[in-house]
Amino acid sequence: NSDFFIMEKISGSAEGHKLVRLKDETLQQKILKDIGQRLADLHQIETDAEIEKILPKPQKETYLSDLIADLYAQLDKLQRHRPVLEFALSWILHEKPVIDDLVLIHGDYRIGNIMINQDHVSGILDWEFSHWGDRREDIGWFTAKCWRFGQDNQIAGGIGAYKNFMQAYAERTEIYIPEFELKFWHILSHVRWAIIAMQQSNRNQNNTQASLELALTEFLVPQLEKNILDIIGEKE
């Protein structure tokens, strides 16, 4: 016997490369608004005794230091010599922002993990990275250049303007995160994705899961490193 769960079947598409290339701008804006409001709803979930059993809330004062330390440990375990990633980890360690509050975050909220059915969000996938953290961690991940699927001028997930996304988010939360606050979180997002890409490549190399897609994922790392250097070099 083993644990299991039953899910409701949902309709829709999570194909990021198609969603960011929709020709109907009005449709894109409607979808983007729903994406922003769904994230806002998630960030307003409060903890309780049952949630604490499976997802305990960390200390606000140590959450970010612990997250960065975990990334250092993951990179060390990979046994790769990646000076740019090491430099980026040093940068984010010394540039940590003040954390005002911890909310329930998805951890991988991006185009590709959001099911779209016609003009609305029908489901959100891949919750294995969920944890308590700063809301900007989710917002930074969703808007990071590495998750825009080539539509770099559309900061909000490759499908729309940042202000439209945040206005939808603010309608539910009364919180609007200015874009200039995301520099730290964008660098963190790129470092994290680079580490995940190398971990996925290892799964193929170690014969854990033979997959051409996993094998090729590591080739994303140099571009991620270039993005990191570009972001660090941007003037405030």
Predicted regions, residues:
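ATP-binding pocket architecture of kinase catalytic cores
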Residues: 1-87, 91-101, 120
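Active-site acidic catalytic loop and adjacent metal/ATP-binding pocket
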Residues: 3, 42, 87-139, 143
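A general structural signal marking secondary-structure boundaries and capping sites
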Residues: 13-14, 39, 43-50, 82, ...
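Short, flexible, glycine-rich and Lys/Arg-enriched loop motifs at helix boundaries
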Residues: 16-23, 148-157, 213
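Hydrophobic/aromatic-rich alpha-helical bundle segments in the mid-to-C-terminal region
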Residues: 53-54, 201-217
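Active-site activation/catalytic loop segments of kinase-like enzymes and analogous catalytic loops
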Residues: 137-174, 188-207
